[in-house]
Amino acid sequence: MSNKRNPTLRQHYVPVKFLSAWADDGVLWVRYGHSEPRETSLYGCGFEKGIYTLPQLGFEEYMEVSRFAEDTFKGDEDMLRSYMQMITFPWMWKLVSDGKLTRSEECVLMDMVTQRFISKATMDLMQRVNDKVHSGATVPDDIMEVVDRKNVEGLEDQMCRYETAFWVILDALRRGDVSPLNDKNNVLAFVDYTLTQFLRTPKYLELARTIEANYNEKVAKHIRLAIVYRFKKHLLAEINSMKKVYRIELIRNDTNLDFIIGDVPIVNLEGHEYPKHMDMFLPISPRLAVFMGEKSRLRTENSYLLSLDSESVDSLNRRICEESVLQIYAKSKDVLVGRDYCAMNLLPYSEVYSS
């Protein structure tokens, strides 16, 4: 752990800028497991670790989610195309280099990759590698390393664009201004950034280990869950922009109890291991939170969010604790001392940060 700020590296799973809403003059309260709460600086609780590299998808897993997509979106070519685009990048070139795809399949995959995901220079490099593969030439390992690196850089570039837009929207929401959410691109950026963080935490990685241990299956189900989430969050953004079924709702906390935040900052209120709904709850300050999900469920299963009392805030804080792995954070020591709030899924540092 480092107390020094390094602007080139991500800080933990909750960026320092996000945590700043819980800090007074750069200081906030943190609780590790069942230990006593302690005062720390924003940068004192940040881990210098990049979190934007997606897990690689093996060929068998790729084929599994492809079949899943074909069954799910049978007869809806536009939706299938959109879905496959999301799961294809950046694994397509690994499949090509392994000789796993036919030429026609490669053409389809190439057609799905757009400038939104990858630069022209990277595309040109990958095309040269592809040409070498099909001419029978051996592609040097160092070239493939460059391709792999470019894949990661492409994702980083995409996420940085989402991140930049996210901070603008977040600043507005913290002021109580929801007008940025009237713009479709802003909605997409906000949903994509926040829900992608949900997929990149130690808690989520632990799910893969659990599946493998309990069912003697590799991470196919874990990958499928990730892909379903990734599809749903894009669908959520598209539908929300049309103001029909889904919405992003700013929730105000006027009780005498603050929202806390954890190292897994966003939770699905449904709480099932393989959830059927996307009832995503994200505190953005001690006094404000965001709900992303179906309008109907906000009026039924999650109606308490529309009229919070101290008991419901306490319940939401406990959900944050349940999802957290190592640490929870609060603006006031009293919030952590007066209740049995603690991170509920403690894992050794070596397991959490070795991936």
Tell where the protein language model's regions lie, with residue ranges:
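Alpha-helical structural context detector biased toward long hydrophobic helices
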Residues: 2-355
